[in-house]
């Protein structure tokens, strides 16, 4: 998976610096 370490809720499809959102979870991607 491109995502790891689920965090607080977020908007699906939202992305920013080394982060992504999937299934309402904010995830941190490996740099």
From Swiss-Prot:
UniProt subcellular location = Secreted
Q: Which GO terms describe its molecular function?
A: toxin activity
GO-annotated cellular components? extracellular region
Q: What keywords tag this UniProt record?
A: Disulfide bond, Hydroxylation, Neurotoxin, Secreted, Toxin
Keyword Secreted attributed:
yes
Tell me where in this chain the PTM 4-hydroxyproline is found: 6, 31
Regarding tissue, the record states: Expressed by the venom duct.
Supply the domain comment. The cysteine framework is C-C-C-CC-C.
Q: What is this protein called?
A: Conotoxin Cltx-2
